[in-house]
């Protein structure tokens, strides 16, 4: 048992959390502590930044929130903490709703995809400007090109 928890994979962590949604499982990772998926959802009222990572080994996005030990100590107050080797569990103050969790999960992923598309548009715009053959174009062609860029930016 001791050895198993020293080498927990991300699959082990999300499975442990999924099996008991009355608790928030918090895992020590380096100097920070993380809660995954349902655990992050149960702490959503704290407004921590949610990180999303696609994990190839489980072919899915995993949502997590991370925080230092000082935050963990505050979270432990009034939550009946149970300590284990590399993680702890805290009693949740709210009742878990699968429907609300799935809605929150999808919203988090949609928000990241919107941010990624903004970055892609900015990158595409910079790339377009960088690669435009200004020296080989007439002033009228340059004017038309700038007008198209303005239209693209104003969308």
Located regions from the model:
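Basic, polar low-complexity surface loops/patches
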Residues: 4-155
